[in-house]
Amino acid sequence: MDAIKKKMQAMKLEKDNAMDRADTLEQQNKEANNRAEKTEEEIRATQKKMQQVENELDQAQEQLSAANTKLDEKEKALQNAEGEVAALNRRIQLLEEDLERSEERLNTATTKLAEASQAADESERMRKVLENRSLSDEERMDALENQLKEARFLAEEADRKYDEVARKLAMVEADLERAEERAESGESKIVELEEELRVVGNNLKSLEVSEEKANQREETYKEQIKTLANKLKAAEARAEFAERSVQKLQKEVDRLEDELVNEKEKYKSITDELDQTFSELSGY
């Protein structure tokens, strides 16, 4: 009987120990599950951060691409503006050369007109002198008549030359007037071109500033991309570490569940044995 009591006490003690171990294993299992859930939450948060980092990286790359496209467009606009400035400078040079040629033709015509006027005045003076003189010498009269004829011829020639010069002068004046109109138009165009040149210069300065800012933004984007890439690598490393931790915790959970099953089986076996013992005692 004492042996049975001792056996029952031992079995009860073993049962209590088994229950304690089962409770401990259940608590450990709960803690392991909690750690696994926490780790899974960290993994989800890490994956979310990774997705956010990837989105930020894509956005930064798109902004960098847009900045490069805008910079290329500004460089093309700058080249077009430089071509327009060069063409305008060539047109100004041609207008200045045309004006110089017109001024030279005007000076030549003015000189020829002065010479013709001087010859006409001289002929008129000689004619008046010959008319006012009364010569008795026939030979001198003939000579004077010849001189008069020659003077008249010279006068007529001078008149003809004068008319020709006047006609040429009129043509030159017309050319000069057109040249002046072109010059005025050219001056207006020069003013417009200077204004356009000033605007182009301002645009060039703006483009230079924009290019400098674009370069600064490009460097900033590169730094951001580098930082984001480092963050992405760190996030991937944390995710990989978390995944390994989850696998390790899962193995620990599986092991604890196996131990819990074994302890439950032991507890059931002890309970069955106690029930059988109680039945045997009741039979006595």
From Swiss-Prot:
InterPro entries xrefs: Tropomyosin
Coiled coil: 1-273
Record's compositionally biased regions (Basic and acidic residues): 12-45
Any Pfam family matching the protein: Tropomyosin
GO BP terms: regulation of muscle contraction
GO molecular function: protein homodimerization activity
Keyword Acetylation set for record: no
Disordered: region residues: 1-54
Tissue distribution: Muscle (at protein level). Expressed in leg and chest protection muscle (at protein level). Expressed in claw muscle.
KW Repeat (keyword) present: yes
Keyword field: Allergen, Coiled coil, Muscle protein, Repeat
Domain notes: The molecule is in a coiled coil structure that is formed by 2 polypeptide chains. The sequence exhibits a prominent seven-residues periodicity.
Family designation: Belongs to the tropomyosin family.
Complex and partners: Homodimer.
Function: Tropomyosin, in association with the troponin complex, plays a central role in the calcium dependent regulation of muscle contraction.
Protein name stated in the entry: Tropomyosin
Organism the protein comes from: Eriocheir sinensis
